[in-house]
Amino acid sequence: MTSRFLLQKNSRRLHGGLAKGVAVFRRTPKTCKTMPGEPAPSGQLPAATDLSSLQGARVALVADDENVRIGALRQQCRFSYGLLLDRVTKEAKPVAAIAVITAAPGDDGRQNYLETRGWQALVLPREQHAGANGPRLYTNVDTDLGTETGYLLGTTSIDVLLICSGDGDLCLSIARAAARHRPKVRVVTLAVPGSASHQLWRRRDLFAAHIALGRDLTRPLNRQPSASNPKTYV
């Protein structure tokens, strides 16, 4: 970045005194190299998801279900776990695929959906906690997701850890732990454009790449229940 210092004569009075000159800094625009997968400024979903950063690697996938699900809904679509795992299987060698979800007691629809598509579902109960303004629904899964990811890092032989979440604080915490304990493991994030922290593609010291979810890994909102099991979806 360059700066040019220009001294300009100015007869305006500043703070009650006559200014003999005003120092003006003019900065030339800085050109930044983009990180692989950096989403477009518009926040729109690309047509295709670029998984080239996973090519041939042993990959462990961990997903923050609430984050990617809500992010996809904002884009008027649904995130497809089945399509993602199919694509990763073609590009790489998935070792584990875990999604952390929350569900009310007796509601196993989301769990069935994930397990029939090759994912392991870690189900946390939706709990009401007392707050200053009365009871509130508690659905934060960050601690459990971080713990499960730490277990994966300590017990599996992988080249890449793929975090499916746009939560910057969560992903940074996991990436720092991976850098401390498994420095050879590359940490890659996948998130929905418009619902992803800028840190995911700017912190090149922690993340090897960021993958912007494309429409090829989504389903329309008006999906239909499966004929064989009304609690699962096509």
What do the predicted segments below correspond to?
Residues T2-V234:
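Terminal and domain-boundary accessory regions
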